[in-house]
UniProtKB/Swiss-Prot annotation:
InterPro entries: L3_arc_euk (IPR045077), Ribosomal_L3_dom_3_arc_sf (IPR044892), Ribosomal_uL3 (IPR000597), Ribosomal_uL3_arc (IPR019928), Ribosomal_uL3_CS (IPR019926), Transl_B-barrel_sf (IPR009000). GO terms for molecular function: rRNA binding; structural constituent of ribosome. It comes from Saccharolobus islandicus (strain M.14.25 / Kamchatka #1) (Sulfolobus islandicus). The gene is rpl3. Gene3D superfamilies: 3.30.1430.10, Ribosomal protein L3, domain 3 (4.10.960.10), Translation factors (2.40.30.10). This is Large ribosomal subunit protein uL3.
Length: 351
C-alpha cells in the first residue's frame, strides 16, 4: 500500500504566502480606513516596541462574563516620541485608473530637522548657506501651486513623516525612519490646510489616537532564519522505524517529476515576515515613564524616557523594532471610555 488510507488537511496557510523576508523593516499599510470626522487628522503613528508587562483593570467589554470585575491583562509597551511631518504627497488617478503620486511638496521648515540628512544625503547641499536654502524654496514652491491647481483631481493626501529615534537612547540610533501616513476626515481643502499647518511641527500620539480605542498593528515579525518543514509548516513527523531510512522530519514526496507544486511544504525562511494584527486596544497613553518603568528597566531595552502606550495583549516584532500603528479598518467594537486600571506591575523583569 503506497498511499494513505486517512485524509488530512493541507498544512500551512495559503494566505501567508510567500514566506519570504520583508523588504523593509517599517512597512507602510496597504489599506487605509475611511473615517467620519469633520476635522482632518492623521490615520497612523509610529512607535518602538519596548517589551511586555501586565496590569489589573476593570473589564468593560459588553456581554463579558467578567464585565465590571477586576481582571488580569498582559500588555505590550511601546515608546512613542513625537513624529515630524516633512513633506506632502498628493495622489491622483492616472490613465490606468490607479492613484499615483502627481507631486510632493517639501516645506522649508523641514530643513530645520537636521537628522533628515542622515536619511536623504542630497539635502545636505541645501544647508550650506542662505542662497542654497532659497534654491530649496524655489524648487518646491512651484509644487505647492501645482497641488492647489489640481485639487479637484486629487484623491487623497499623505504626509511623509520622520520619527525621532535620537530621543530614545535605548535604541542607539540617530537615523530617522521615514514613512507615509494618510490624512483622513474633512474635505480636500481642509486636508490641504491641515497638512500645510503641521509641516515641520511635532505631532504627538494624543493628536492621533485616544485611550480605549482599537487600532491595527503593522510590522515585521521576529526572524527565525532557515527552518525545516516541521517547524515552518507544522507537518506531521514521519514514523521512526527501520524502513524510513531517509529521515522522519521531512515530507513524504514533493510530487511528480514534472515540477514541484507551489503548495508543497518545503524548508526555507521562517520569520521576519510582514504581518498585520487587527483590533489591538489602547489600554493607556502616558507621559510619565515612572508609571510603567519596572525596577532595573525592561530586559534588552532599558528604561522608557518618552511618551508611551500600553496595548492589550502581545504584538509582533522584536524589542526596539519600529511598529506602525493604524486606525482600525474593521473595529469589532467602539469604546466610549478608557479602561480603568487598578494596578501596574513594576517588579523587576530580570528574575
Amino acid at each position: 500500500m503506497g498511499h494513505r488510507k486517512l485524509a488530512s488537511p493541507r498544512r500551512g496557510s495559503a494566505g501567508l504566502r510567500p514566506r519570504k523576508r520583508s523588504s523593509e523593516l517599517l512597512p507602510t499599510p496597504r489599506t487605509w480606513p475611511q473615517i467620519n470626522s469633520p476635522n482632518p487628522k492623521l490615520l497612523g503613528f509610529v512607535g518602538y516596541k519596548v517589551g511586555m508587562s501586565h496590569v489589573f483593570m476593570i473589564d468593560d467589554w459588553p456581554n463579558s462574563p467578567t464585565n465590571g470585575k477586576e481582571i488580569y491583562m498582559p500588555v505590550t509597551v511601546l515608546e512613542v516620541p513625537p513624529i515630524i511631518p516633512l513633506a506632502l504627497r498628493a495622489y491622483a488617478v492616472d490613465g490606468k485608473g490607479e492613484p499615483n503620486v502627481i507631486t510632493e511638496y517639501w516645506s522649508p521648515s523641514s530643513l530645520q530637522f537636521l537628522d533628515i540628512t542622515r536619511r536623504i544625503h542630497s539635502f545636505s547641499s541645501f544647508l550650506k548657506n542662505d542662497e542654497s536654502k532659497k534654491k530649496f524654496e524655489e524648487k518646491f514652491g512651484s509644487k505647492l501651486d501645482l497641488i492647489k491647481s489640481n485639487l479637484d483631481r486629487i484623491v487623497y493626501f499623505r504626509l511623509l513623516v520622520a520619527t525621532q529615534p535620537r530621543k530614545i537612547p535605548s535604541l542607539g540610533k540617530k537615523v530617522p525612519d521615514l514613512v507615509e501616513i494618510q490624512i483622513g476626515g474633512g474635505e480636500k481643502k481642509a486636508q490641504l490646510d491641515y497638512a500645510l499647518n503641521v509641516l515641520g511641527k511635532e505631532i504627538s500620539i494624543k493628536d492621533v489616537f485616544k485611550e480605549g480605542q482599537l487600532i491595527d498593528v503593522v510590522g515585521v515579525t521576529k526572524g527565525k532564519g532557515f527552518a525545516g518543514v516541521i517547524k515552518r509548516y507544522s507537518v506531521v513527523e514521519l514514523p521512526r522505524w527501520h524502513k524510513h531510512r531517509k529521515g522522519s522530519r521531512k515530507i513524504g514526496t514533493r510530487g511528480p517529476s514534472l515540477g514541484t507544486p507551489s503548495y508543497t511544504p518545503q524548508p526555507g525562511q521562517l520569520g521576519f515576515h510582514r504581518r498585520t494584527e487587527y483590533n489591538k486596544r489602547i489600554i493607556k497613553i502616558g507621559d510619565d515613564p515612572k508609571e510603567i518603568n519596572p525596577a532595573g528597566g525592561f530586559v534588552r531595552y532599558g528604561i522608557v524616557r518618552n511618551t508611551y502606550i500600553l496595548l492589550e495583549g502581545s504584538i509582533l516584532g522584536s524589542k526596539k523594532r519600529p511598529i506602525f500603528l493604524r486606525e482600525a479598518v474593521r473595529p469589532s467594537y467602539v469604546f466610549e471610555n478608557a479602561p480603568k486600571i487598578t494596578y501596574v506591575n513594576l517588579l523587576s523583569k530580570q528574575g
